[in-house]
């Protein structure tokens, strides 16, 4: 069995495949750049790819493709209609990286509050006065608006509340009462 990946997955995932499959990691989100490598691919794991990148031509370049797996929850990068017509199931990994995505969002928010990127660049140049040029601020008692309180939005809200932030949420599927249970004020 041959498994092709647009890019490497986590070590735990690779360990599950060890000894069970030949693995080709393309390190390229554009399968058209390596169609010749897909000829005998049985499974295609898509981590990152442009919208529609896994198209009919990509699928047909393998004479043995049995499944397309997309890490995450979106199907944007896969032409699901063509896969369905070709009898190739497309699967996703819902929930697998929810916490990581939420933590990444919080990390970016904290980096912005402290001007981390610009400060890092300037301090590496020896410009220590950047601290005075751009004022950093604490997020405590600041307000965070979260649009969409699905699984990831709820985790972000929980983390923000843990940072003593006020959280306002907009979600057409949750009532004011449901949001209040999360500690979120409905927008």
Residue ranges and their predicted role:
Residues 31-34, 55-58, 135, 183-184:
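Acidic, amphipathic alpha-helical patches
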Residues 133-187:
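Rossmann-like dinucleotide/phosphate-binding beta-alpha-beta segment
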Residues 1-41:
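N-terminal glycine-/charge-rich "phosphate-binding" loop or analogous flexible N-terminal tail
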Residues 7, 42-123, 136:
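Phosphate/diphosphate ligand-binding glycine-rich loop within oxidoreductases
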Residues 12-19, 35-36, 78-85, 174-182:
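Short loop/helix-cap segments at secondary-structure boundaries that form the rim of catalytic
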Residues 83, 105, 126, 148, ...:
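Conserved hydrophobic/aromatic pocket- or pore-lining residues that grip, position, or stack substrates
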Residues 24-29, 49-51, 124-132, 181-187:
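Short gly/ser/thr-rich secondary-structure transition/capping motifs
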């Amino acid at each position: 069995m041959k498994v092709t990946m647009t890019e490497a997955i986590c070590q735990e995932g690779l360990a599950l495949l060890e000894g069970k499959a030949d693995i080709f990691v393309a390190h390229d989100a554009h399968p058209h750049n390596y169609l010749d490598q897909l000829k005998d691919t049985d499974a295609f794991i898509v981590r990152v790819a442009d919208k529609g990148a896994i198209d009919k031509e990509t699928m047909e370049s393998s004479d043995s493709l049995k499944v397309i797996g997309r890490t995450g929850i979106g199907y944007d990068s896969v032409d699901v209609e063509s896969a369905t017509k070709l009898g190739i199931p497309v699967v996703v990994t819902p929930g697998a990286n929810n916490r990581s995505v939420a933590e990444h969002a919080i990390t970016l928010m904290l980096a912005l509050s402290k001007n981390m990127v610009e400060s890092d660049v300037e301090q590496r140049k020896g410009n220590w006065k950047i601290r005075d040029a751009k004022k950093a601020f604490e997020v405590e008692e600041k307000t965070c608006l979260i649009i969409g309180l699905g699984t990831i939005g709820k985790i972000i809200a929980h983390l923000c509340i843990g940072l003593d932030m006020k959280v306002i949420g907009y979600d057409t599927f949750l009532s004011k009462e449901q949001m209040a249970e999360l500690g979120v004020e409905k927008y």
